[in-house]
Regions:
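Catalytic domains of carbohydrate-active enzymes, especially glycoside hydrolases
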Residues: 30-42, 109-111, 116-121
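A charged helix-plus-loop insertion that forms the helical arch/lid used to bind
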Residues: 84-99, 142-144
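Alpha-helical scaffold segments that flank or form the walls of functional sites
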Residues: 98-119, 198, 269-275
Length: 525
């Protein structure tokens, strides 16, 4: 049976496809004119603020009410600053600093930047409680392992973003923190132990008025032993809508991920997600072509004609998406070039207001722009130093040899985003030598050559989640056995602080986190 135009338009009203390039392709312009609800931007679409503003203006010229979304968590997952590294630390660093007013102020600054670029929904923050240090995909994206800490900072992030007129979207419901499987590749399972704690940040975000919640492709046997949360009516309709009382937009994580598409295909997973209670389908991180977007639309429409998806459920989803678009329009963020309600330079004023409301002991970030930027101030406050020896001295006596051990990143993190300590330290201590090694390069002979090359210099070894990568552990052990005066800088999750004569934990790998560590090493902090 041919699919009706009205039904296809209704299916388009719940889709957020991605695309390739810095300008919208013809197929996307056409679909927007036909009523496509949203677009998801990725780093491949972003060259700079002015270009993004032109891009979103072009999208809005085809559909004035289009929702433009982006995964901009700051820190490890950045789309706006993928080419340079983030100027703001990620969630874990903010949790370590544990200044709620600072978190809210940084989120308001981010929201103002997004609003000026014409972006109306940010798929952030992560409200996951990272209770499993071996989690391969959350880690530093979480505010921490304590549910109460995650809850207060996720709430602050929501307030900050939405004060700028940009919708926040907490993720990955009902909590991806206590898992050991990356849902890009498989189906993580959430144990019953600790599930109540994992829900706390989401429940509090709902009370905070968060506009959107992103589902996790997770199996929650205590609610549904067969279907992952994204496809489960028991989790989405029963738990999120019924028990938590959420009335905003339920957004899926990327529907092409193996945890859901592996069993049902991309289109089948999308239709099942809407039937389960989701309102918007994100796609395009890995499949950014016209045929994928058209196939999902057709699969949703076909599910209605086949009786698998009630048309009223699809219409309800489209209504919720329209209401969110109306909120962003009334907030002022939907017009390209808008500064949102937070406005230009809002960080100082927002910080002052937040500090007054929250009893902040730091004065939030007022005046921070004159000291290297608000994000750098926050990154400095997250650095922790553990000394196990009086040698080497800090600051370093001379230009060091920096060895950066670089693991492969998960798919949520742009693999081209720069990170490390070597580059900023080279600026602070001219003559610094930097060597970066991947897993296949950190061989015994290569490490011996490095030890020889570093003779007479301080040695700094930079690692990232060393506890999750045996090759990093082995390389570090090799270097420490030869140079007991080594400074170790951990830019991932610091599961251990007893490595090196001096251990510096940045609690993040954002550009500003590397800068903050370099300042400690050079004595310029």
């Amino acid at each position: 049976m041919p699919l009706s135009g009205d039904l296809l338009r209704l299916a388009d009203a719940v889709l957020f496809p991605g695309f390739a390039g810095h300008e919208p392709p013809d197929w996307l312009r056409r679909r927007l004119g036909e009523g496509l609800a949203g677009v998801a931007l990725f780093s491949r679409n972003i060259a700079g603020p002015a270009q993004v503003a032109r891009l979103t203006a072009a999208l809005r010229a085809e559909n004035p009410s289009v929702l433009v979304g982006v995964d901009e968590e700051s820190g490890e997952v950045t789309r706006l600053e993928a080419a340079t590294g983030s100027s703001r630390p990620g969630a874990y660093a903010l949790g370590v600093a544990d200044d709620v007013a600072m978190t809210e102020a940084l989120a308001a600054e981010l929201g103002a930047d997004l609003a000026r670029s014409g972006i109306t929904i940010d798929f952030a923050p992560s409200a996951d409680v990272n209770s499993n240090p071996d989690n391969p995909v959350i880690g530093l994206r979480s505010f921490g392992a304590d549910p109460a800490l995650v809850s207060r900072h996720a709430g602050a992030f929501v307030r900050g973003l939405q004060s700028a007129g940009v919708a926040a979207c907490v993720k990955h419901f009902p909590g991806h923190g206590d898992t050991a499987v990356d849902s890009h590749h498989g189906v993580p399972e959430v144990a019953a132990d600790g599930f109540k704690d994992a829900l706390l940040p989401f429940a509090d975000a709902v009370r905070e008025g968060v506009k959107a919640v992103m589902t996790g492709h997770l199996l929650v046997p205590s609610y549904d032993g067969e279907l992952p949360a994204t496809l489960s009516p028991k989790v989405l309709t029963g738990l999120l809508r019924g028990e938590l009382g959420f009335q905003g937009v339920i957004v899926t994580d990327a529907i092409e991920m193996a945890a859901v598409a592996g069993a049902y295909g991309i289109g089948g997973a999308a239709a099942r997600a809407i039937a389960a209670g989701a309102d918007a389908i994100c796609v395009g991180g890995e499949h950014a072509d016209e045929s994928t977007a058209a196939g999902i639309r057709d699969a949703i429409a076909a599910a209605v004609t086949q009786g698998l998806l009630p048309e009223e459920r699809l219409a309800d989803a489209a209504r919720r998406v329209r209401e969110l678009a109306a909120w962003t329009a009334s907030s002022g963020s939907a017009a390209t070039g808008s500064q949102g309600r937070a406005g230009s330079g809002a960080i100082a004023a927002t910080g002052a207001r937040s500090g007054a409301r929250s009893g902040d002991r730091s004065g939030a970030l007022a005046g921070a722009r004159g000291d290297g930027g608000a994000g750098l101030v926050a990154a400095r406050r997250a650095v922790r130093v553990v000394r196990r020896s009086t040698t080497p001295e800090l600051p370093l006596a001379g230009a060091p040899h920096v060895v950066e051990l670089a693991p492969e990143m998960n798919l949520a993190i742009d693999r081209h985003t720069p990170w490390g300590v070597g580059e900023p330290l080279t600026r602070l201590l001219p003559g610094t030598v930097v060597t970066r090694l991947g897993s296949g390069e950190a061989t015994g002979p290569a490490l011996e050559r490095l030890i020889g090359a570093a003779s007479g210099r301080p040695l700094v070894v930079v690692v990232r989640d060393v506890h999750r990568h045996p090759w990093q552990e082995e390389a570090l052990r090799h270097l420490l056995s030869a140079r007991r005066d080594t400074v170790v800088v951990e830019m991932g999750l610091p599961a251990r602080s007893d490595l090196g004569a001096v251990h510096i934990a940045t609690h993040g790998s954002a550009r500003v986190c590397g800068q903050a560590a370099a300042e400690v090493l050079a004595g310029s902090l």
